[in-house]
Amino acid sequence: MAGSSSSGVFNSLRATLDMREAELVEIPLIQPADPFLDMAGEDLRRRIFLTENENGDSLCLRPEFTIPVCRNHIALNAATPKRYAYLGEVFRQHRDGAAEFLQAGIEDLGASDEAASDARSIADALSCVRAAAPEAELEIVLGDQSVFAGMLKALGLPQGWRKKLLRSFGDANSMEQVLAELTGAQRRDPLPETLAGLVAEGDESGLARMLEAEMLEAGISPSAGRSPAEIARRLIEKEDLAATRFPASALDLLKQFLETRVTLDSAAVTLRAFASEHALDLAAVLQKFEARSEAIANAGIATKDIIYDASFGRPLDYYTGLVYEIRAPGVEKEGVLAGGGRYDRLLTMLGASENIPGVGFSIWLDRLQMLVGEKK
């Protein structure tokens, strides 16, 4: 296993979590696979260990904690606000190296003060990392899904393109492809005639049935990645969007925005100046951005030491605002020790009867061990 449950890092994290006013929750190793297949990103879906029970239900080894912690909260019909801590194994397939890792984190559900709970999440994550690696050189990088969404709206992009760009936010290669599609610069391979007709008619259910049949004929499980229904929806959406083009001047502004990378203490001023110069209405999202920055400073974290990167996000539908990472030079996976963010849509997507906002983070213990020189 990558990371040891008897290491100094493990023990320091356990002690720190115990002091963060969060209930340590036990989550079963075997989980229903569908929530992860439906909501997780493309990279995680490919790495899930899948199996079936005797009834044919898709199951998996726990690939992460956020989704099952939220499902557990819904199942218990627990009151909010509620904070959950976790520390345990996650399982992800890799071509080489370990497939079992230790993760720790906190999920903060139902807090009414968004700015304060965002700041607390960063402070909690930083405290956990610092407890294990007090002398490490760290970098905090922060992004904001809502500022990016506000930028797309201010530019007047159609809803379909906004959704497509939001799904690519944080994935540089995917974003580049979508921007190329917007300018008409990308050539698209023609669809097989049998599929093209259904796409042209917008027959999503018929297209999904045909895709599922072709997958089964080819020996591909329809639950191994994107579902036939999701593929059908995206094919039809892509065809609709192909007819839409956007002014080059607006795309240039979007690219300029995505190149913004400044310290958090100057980020709001930089963004307001950009909005004013180009007559963009970002007032509402920047008001929330400034409130969070103030809350972060009030939590004792120097905003001059945090980088705001306008292109940093996560290509997952349920992230709605803050996203962040704590990084260290020389550590694998681009130095990422911890990652977190706000996911106000997730619990509703998982079946909650009311809107429950959430923010949380996960820490990779094996990377922390590497940083402090512990043997795995």
UniProtKB/Swiss-Prot annotation:
Pathway: Amino-acid biosynthesis; L-histidine biosynthesis; L-histidine from 5-phospho-alpha-D-ribose 1-diphosphate: step 1/9. It comes from the Bacteria. Disulfide bonds: none annotated. The lineage of its organism: Bacteria, Pseudomonadati, Pseudomonadota, Alphaproteobacteria, Hyphomicrobiales. It comes from Brucella anthropi (strain ATCC 49188 / DSM 6882 / CCUG 24695 / JCM 21032 / LMG 3331 / NBRC 15819 / NCTC 12168 / Alc 37). The keyword Cell inner membrane does not apply. GO terms for molecular function: histidine-tRNA ligase activity. Heteromultimer composed of HisG and HisZ subunits. Required for the first step of histidine biosynthesis. May allow the feedback regulation of ATP phosphoribosyltransferase activity by histidine. This is ATP phosphoribosyltransferase regulatory subunit. Belongs to the class-II aminoacyl-tRNA synthetase family. HisZ subfamily. GO terms for biological process: histidyl-tRNA aminoacylation; L-histidine biosynthetic process. InterPro entries: aa-tRNA-synth_II/BPL/LPL, HisRS-like_core, HisRS/HisZ, HisZ. It is found in: Cytoplasm. One of its GO terms (cellular component) is cytoplasm. This function is generally fulfilled by the C-terminal part of HisG, which is missing in some bacteria such as this one. HAMAP family: HisZ. Gene3D superfamilies: Bira Bifunctional Protein, Domain 2 (3.30.930.10). Keywords: Amino-acid biosynthesis, Cytoplasm, Histidine biosynthesis.
